[in-house]
Design a protein with these regions (language model features):
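Active-site neighborhood of HAD-like aspartate-dependent phosphohydrolases
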Residues: 1-20
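Conserved phosphate-coupling serine/threonine residues in phosphotransfer and NTP-handling enzymes
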Residues: 58
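Generic surface-pattern signal
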Residues: 9, 13-15, 26-30, 143-151
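C-terminal cap/substrate-recognition subdomain and adjoining C-terminal extension
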Residues: 43, 50-52, 61-152
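Short, acidic loop-to-helix structural element flanking the phosphoryl-transfer center
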Residues: 13-17, 23-55, 63-66
């Protein structure tokens, strides 16, 4: 929702309910209801078909990974398991481009940083971050700025 303006989820939930939240996120039926962002499937599919090597990097909590990845591969069947990296240290990866909606995941690295616009990151105003609003915009940025080669 638009009223969530921070990544600190604990400020939006009742005390002692964090475990309940993670329990919900661990459930397969929760992930059966998740839909990709508008244009995400099409943009990633086009980039893969154009010849780019795409890697998905997630900093998700380990408890949610099995159910989340099962959902992900259902929605993005053209992405292979070896194209998924699970790490909270995204800045350590040797990347060309990183797309994230959490600005903390884009700090302290040399790759191009695309900040996907969300209510939770409206406060961010950094010169080295390019704010993007749609997956079509992301697709065009990569096509315009990178010859076909590995893009992470």
């Amino acid at each position: 929702p638009d009223d969530i303006t921070s990544w600190n989820i604990e400020q939006y939930i009742l005390p002692n309910t964090k475990e309940i939240l993670f329990y919900i996120l661990e459930q397969k039926d929760f992930w059966d209801t998740v839909q990709p962002m508008n244009g995400a499937v099409e943009a990633l599919y086009r980039l893969v078909n154009d010849g780019y090597n795409i890697y998905i990097v997630t900093a998700s909590d380990y408890r949610t990974i099995p159910a989340k990845l099962k959902c992900f591969f259902r929605l993005f069947p053209f992405i292979r398991q070896d194209q998924v990296v699970v790490t909270k240290e995204k800045q350590l990866l040797d990347l060309d481009v990183m797309i994230d909606d959490n600005p903390e995941n884009l700090c302290h690295a040399s790759y191009d940083k695309l900040l996907f616009d969300r209510p939770s990151n409206q406060w961010v105003d950094k010169e080295d971050l390019k704010r993007v609003y749609t997956w079509a915009e992301i697709y065009q940025f990569i096509k315009d700025n990178y010859p076909i080669r590995t893009v992470y």
